[in-house]
Amino acid sequence: MNKTPLLLALVASLGLAGCSTLAPKDTAVAPGIPAQWPAEASQGEVTDVAALGWRDFFADERLQQVIGQALDNNRDLRVAVLNVEKARGQYRVQRADRVPGLAATGQMERQGTNAGVTEQFTAGVGVADFELDLFGRVRNLSESALQQYFAVAANRRNAQLSLVAETATAWLTYGADAQQLRISEATLKTYEDSLRLAEARHERGGSSGLELSQTRTLVETARTDAARLRGQLAQDRNALALLAGGQVDADLLPDSIEPQLLALAPPPAGLPSDVLLQRPDIMAAEHQLLAANANIGAARAAFFPSITLTGSIGSGSGELSNLFDSGTRVWSFLPKITLPIFQGGKLRANLAVANADRDIALAQYEKAIQSGFRETSDALALNVSLDEQVSAQQRLVDAAETANRLSQARYDAGLDSFVTLLDARRTAYSAQQTRLQTELAQQTNRITLYKVMGGGWHERG
């Protein structure tokens, strides 16, 4: 038997498949952001944040262990990883349509007529319904699935960056609240001592009822703050446990907020803002745009004829025992062409949907770039501002504590009224609390800057 026609048909089909595509070549992107960072945010030497490992950025070993626990056990990150596996499988399924699928077949046919019963046995290997992709429909569907896979992989990377940043922020928040609670409890003890002295003076007639009531006000205010902070501390630990995927050991929890992070230098003047394109969320939006472009190509190809090939080669015989004997070879080749004539507007509607999806993906891509630029610019602007605020707030705390000591001494000497002392105490207590809040804002902004510039993917730089 001459096998040449079938072999030539298969080779030709593989050569022609995927030779053409109707997908748009380029899509103009106009994100509407400056080409460079604002001048006020551009100074000094730049740190390659994306290459800076999170173990290098977060210096505290306890925090490193908590982040490691979160990366191992966080359920949201686990879902993101599984979504990558799912997208990879979907791409492989779609890619398989680009090559012929071979299948072995076996068949027995019995047929009865007036002349008697006949039997026919066949066995062979064949290709069924392989689409000759002359206009790129299958190719574009495969490309769309590939870009979707890349987008999901970028989203998984973004999920890790967010998890690292959120875990570090929750850990530092716990430390700040623990330190605030300690200050509130120490202040409460001091106020309770003052209340006992005020009660003793009042009993001797040395102070008024107003002074006693004002002292009690200080005590109850500090007591309320301490109770609130104890509840807040419990909530902080619950939030950290959710991020870490389980309870965090007590010896890994901070008892104060201290400089725990590597300071990030702002980018130098003239650094182009297109470095944001390396952010995983922007990369995901870009891949979604490319997938939408490929879907347009598939929708356009649906307007053209489709050619499918079916062929087989094997053996056929009326006797099972003679199935593979010489002279029993059989083959078939069945090309089929389908030309869409009337679909009730379905093809045009599918193309309109594909175009709309592309426009949506383009708008989302441009918005992702704009959002990334704003997030980074905001973090850079706050970076310098918060450093100045922390320094100023520390000077305020020092001055308030000095004023409190002097007011106490002058009150004891009878030179100042209790109202002056009361105001000094409140100012000192408030200054300490505000300093902690400012230090926490400084630390969390550094985490934000690390995240928005692409840091947190590598463990070590």
Ranges and model annotations:
Residues 43-45, 49-58, 63, 68, ...:
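Small/polar, glycine/serine/threonine/aspartate-rich low-complexity segments that form flexible
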